[in-house]
Amino acid sequence: MRAVIPYKKAGAKSRLSPVLSLQEREEFVELMLNQVISSLKGAGIEQVDILSPSVYGLEEMTEARVLLDEKDLNEALNRYLKEAEEPVLIVMADLPLLSPEHIKEISSTEKDVCIVPGKGGGTNALFIKNPSKYRVKYYGSSFLTHCSIATDSGQDFEIYDSFMAGTDIDEPEDLVELLIHGKGAAKDYIESKFRLEVKKGRVGLVPL
């Protein structure tokens, strides 16, 4: 099996712009990417590909193979799946709470497809045993769409429901979860800029 991580560093994570500058966001997404790669390698996945529209930020990448594709996310991934001859795990790059243990559990499914839902109806990971028979359609309520795609193509699927694997970092409030539950370089980076504070019974971020 192999894993593929869609990734774009330039202008990344615009929804974090209220709390992080462009430079900080680009530094942060690179740290998250490296943690995801480390988790994949820790789970025993030797072949890790990064699918990106640009080499920006990946010039010195040695832990994964960089594949350039300027097409949109769905077109690029569907081309990748069509050419794959072994099971594929698609993992988003903004999952710093994802562990090797999660990855092992996801990829050990007895079903044809394992779908990891993200917040707001998204899809954080997809394990596909027969990639040439499956297509992806991200954006919008992609989790429901990916369930339907599996059913319509005659493939049974499992839903891997996990808080940690389901926590993608998109909004400022997601950084709270990273500080509470995370570890590693991505957490350390945010911890160098913010502290947690309880206000009106809710935990929030306060700049240092």
Curated annotation (Swiss-Prot):
Keywords in alphabetical order: GTP-binding, Nucleotide-binding, Nucleotidyltransferase, Transferase
This protein's name: 2-phospho-L-lactate guanylyltransferase
Pathway annotation: Cofactor biosynthesis; coenzyme F420 biosynthesis
Lineage: Archaea, Methanobacteriati, Methanobacteriota, Stenosarchaea group, Methanomicrobia
Cystine pairings recorded for this chain: none
One Gene Ontology MF term: GTP binding
Originating organism: Methanosarcina mazei (strain ATCC BAA-159 / DSM 3647 / Goe1 / Go1 / JCM 11833 / OCM 88) (Methanosarcina frisia)
Subunit structure: Homodimer.
Enzyme Commission numbers on file: 2.7.7.68
Leading EC class: transferase
Transmembrane segments: none
Originating gene: cofC
GO biological process: F420-0 metabolic process
